[in-house]
Amino acid sequence: MALTVGKKLPNVSLHTKTEDSVEEINLLDWCGERRIVFFYVPGAFTQTCTNTHLPGFVRLFDSFAKKSVDVVACISVNDAHVMKAWGEQVGALGKIVMLADSHAQLAQALGVTRDFGPVLGERAKRCCFVADKGIIIHSFIEEPGQLTGSSAEAILEALQ
């Protein structure tokens, strides 16, 4: 069962690739007193994720600051090197924080894992969460093959 609005974010670690190293980020510490939007994609470099989902957040990045969002992050069950390379290709770096949930620990804690079959294996469902000071204030988990309520446009509308 997925974590719902009003629940505290799980205390798990994610990873990000900097120029020189891979850094571990504790989600709760990283969230701190900020309002964050983080969205999961099933896989870096996959069709909908690359052509629509991540580019929507890049394109509308400035609109999130106007809604009092401090950070927008993209997470996938990939490694930090892949996430950085994908962020570079899509033009997300410097706007969207690219985070790796390499072993699906956060996805499991949030209750959003799904088996995508022999090619991708266990991944996270396409979804989006908004957290304020570590507490979930909005969430949307997509049905397989859909991109509706977790899109940048839908999340901006939910933040009205």
Regions found by a protein language model. Give the residues of each.
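Chalcogenol-based redox active-site neighborhoods
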Residues: 1-160
